[in-house]
Swiss-Prot record:
InterPro entries reported for this sequence: 6-hairpin_glycosidase_sf, 6hp_glycosidase-like_sf, Glyco_hydro_37, Glyco_hydro_37_CS
Database matches in PROSITE patterns: TREHALASE_1, TREHALASE_2
Chief location bin: membrane
The name this protein goes by in its record: Trehalase
Catalytic activity annotation: alpha,alpha-trehalose + H2O = alpha-D-glucose + beta-D-glucose
Cytoplasmic membrane side: 617-626
Length: 626
């Protein structure tokens, strides 16, 4: 019997037979097309319409995001009236120079929504610095602590009073932004920012950011991709509940939890209601989550780029489906990556082959499982027994589904699932081991899972890259592909391995941490900048590719490094060394210093050392079995 999947679309269920996958795409797209798609937001200035199209296609600015972050000088109706008169004066064909003058006359520069803000809870020397023994790394962490003040943003009260003049979404409390072109808060970035802020003892700032987030859930129904109205049809990986968990571990502010638990549940319900899909495997139906944005038109912040690439499609329906795929990939946080390409059942192709809506991601579902577990715990604390049972049931169902649909025993990892071709996607991503972090597997078989995952990582040669773990092994030119290494993915792998309590996995977690910290430290020393992403192939190199230049700042990069320095600060050193011995106690360990000419020898020794660990582990397991 051929396996099949049931895809929920609106109120209907569509049964997709794997033997006829060429019909699957047609059926699903037709279902999506039955209802007219809404625009990214209701603004005829920032999200849709002739004004947006004319200005963005004129390429006044190098970055399309610049215009849609500007403030209108007059109300929207007056702005649109001025635009119509402008177009009439120039017979509907203004020059680029004339369009630029119109924009300068009609809009204030980007960033006009903010005022200076000096956080009251910032401290010059947070306690975690004392746990970092290496002087250079301690100074590095101290400087990262200072960067929070540069990344802090507080909105002017005028944004609240005259919200229609801005594309930014008003929130009552100051925020820490990623940096560079990202002038507003971003959803999943904020998890690592919060981790760093908590180490910096900026508890009031964190509480304000969490309060901002739940206010958005209350207002919009979920947390958007970022703090602009053009993001309000898409979200990002649902990291709010894990953020709250980090805050509660440090502050024990259960009054905040009691007041806002219903909003955490509301966000969870959004994902259950709007982002789930039924899949049948071996005659059993499972429910898992996917990313799925459904608005029309190009992304306003990348309007020209999207519009031009859409011209390879013939019909408006095909173009709108392509736009939805672009925005769905943005919702995933991985915009863009060959991870979301489907071409003849493979990950080959280019942006026109994006099929993010038809891929069940390991990481998204692992996070949703963890959210259900945490909501059960929170309701237990509040005495809501019926809700405890509900979330425990959800978590158990999710764990079973992840095991049945995503785990590949022969590969030794969890794999994304392609619902068009009804296959697991056997391509390396750091997120393929994320269930180890969220405990979304049979803990009783931990040793078996860990052994297979370690062999999987060794097979994919993750330690052959001096600058970190690459995002994928594909050379597509997209920024979420090789050779870029992204901070959150390093964090996921390190924490997943460390949480197993397996000494070999924890050793590997330490060595990945050491390599990542040293690469970031080297880049910072040479440029006095923290980057959004790094080059996996070289220590100290920043990443590239994608739609925009590499960004400085940078929120999640700082948070990850601070967390690793707090965790391993009693062992890490700034110099380029390869650890000769490592134990789990707190005593600093002896190291062997390598010269630049010995780098490859050191890598080889490290790989051999790990391989020996794998072999020894398997022998011990075999002896025990005998």
């Amino acid at each position: 019997m051929a396996s099949s999947c049931s895809i929920r679309c609106g109120s209907r269920n569509i049964l997709v037979n794997a033997a006829a996958t060429f019909l699957a795409l047609l059926v699903v797209l037709r279902c999506f097309a039955n209802a007219e798609k809404p625009s990214p937001c209701q603004s005829d200035v920032y999200c849709r319409g002739e004004l947006l199209h004319t200005i963005q296609m004129a390429s006044i600015y190098k970055d399309s995001k610049t215009f849609v972050d500007m403030k209108m000088k007059r109300p929207p109706d007056e702005t649109l009236k001025s635009f119509r008169e402008f177009m009439e004066r120039h017979e509907q064909m203004p020059t680029r120079y004339q369009i630029e003058r119109f924009v300068n006359d009609t809009f204030d520069p980007e960033g006009s929504e903010f005022e200076d803000w000096d956080p009251d809870d910032w401290t010059f020397r947070p306690k975690f610095l004392s746990r970092i023994l290496d002087d250079d790394l301690r100074n590095f962490a101290s400087e990262l602590n200072g960067i929070w003040k540069m990344l802090g943003r507080k909105m002017k009260d005028d944004v609240r009073v005259n919200e229609e003049l801005y594309s930014i979404i008003y929130v009552p409390h100051p925020v820490i932004v990623p940096g560079g072109r990202f002038r507003e808060f971003y959803y999943w970035d904020s998890y690592w920012i919060v981790k760093g802020l908590l180490l910096s003892e900026m508890y009031t700032t964190v509480k304000g950011m969490l309060t901002n987030f739940v206010s958005l859930v209350d207002k919009i129904g979920f947390i958007p991709n970022g703090g602009r109205i053009y993001y309000t049809m898409r979200s990002q990986p649902p990291m709010l509940i894990p953020m709250v968990d980090e805050y509660l571990k440090i502050t024990h502010d259960y009054e905040w939890l009691e007041n806002n638990l219903y909003l955490l549940e509301k966000e969870f319900d959004f994902w259950m209601t709007n982002r789930t899909v039924e899949i049948e495997v071996d005659g059993v139906n499972y429910v898992l989550a996917r990313y799925n944005e459904q608005s029309s038109g190009p992304r306003p912040e990348s309007y020209k780029e999207d519009y031009l690439t859409s011209q390879s499609f013939r019909t408006n329906e095909e173009k709108d489906n392509y736009y939805s795929e672009l925005k769905t990939a943005a919702e995933s946080g991985w915009d863009f990556s060959s991870r979301w390409f489907i071409l003849d059942g493979t990950n080959k192709g280019n942006l026109t082959n994006l099929k993010t809506r038809y891929i069940i991601p390991v990481d998204l579902n692992s996070i949703i499982y963890r959210n259900a577990v945490l909501l059960a715990q929170y309701n237990q604390r509040m005495g809501n027994e019926s809700k405890v049972a509900y979330y425990q049931k959800r978590a158990a169902e999710w764990k079973r589904a992840i095991q049945a649909v995503l785990w590949h025993d022969e590969v030794g990892a969890w794999l994304d699932y392609d619902i068009l071709n009804d296959i697991k996607r056997d391509y390396f991503y750091p997120t393929n081991i994320l269930p180890l972090w969220t405990d979304c597997y049979d803990i009783a078989k931990r040793e078996e899972y860990v052994s297979k995952v370690l062999k999987y990582l060794e097979k994919n040669k993750i330690m052959l890259n001096l600058g970190g773990i690459p995002t994928t092994l594909e050379h597509s030119g997209e920024q979420w592909d090789y050779p870029n290494a992204w901070p959150p993915l390093q964090y996921f792998v390190i924490m997943a391995l460390n949480k197993t309590e397996d000494p070999w996995a924890q050793r590997l977690a330490y060595e990945i941490s050491e390599r990542w910290v040293r690469s970031n430290y080297k880049a910072y020393n040479e440029t006095h900048s923290m980057f959004e992403k790094y080059d996996a192939t070289v220590s100290g190199g920043h990443g590239g590719g994608g739609e925009y230049e590499v960004q400085l700042g940078f929120g999640w990069s700082n948070g990850v490094i601070m967390d690793l320095l707090n965790r391993y600060g009693d062992k890490l050193t700034a110099e380029d060394r390869f650890v000769a011995t490592f134990h789990s106690n707190s005593t600093p360990q002896p190291v062997v210093v390598s010269t630049a000419g010995q780098v490859m020898t050191g890598i080889l020794a490290l790989v051999i050392s790990l391989a020996a660990g794998f072999i020894g582990k398997m022998r011990c397991a075999n002896n025990a079995a005998q």
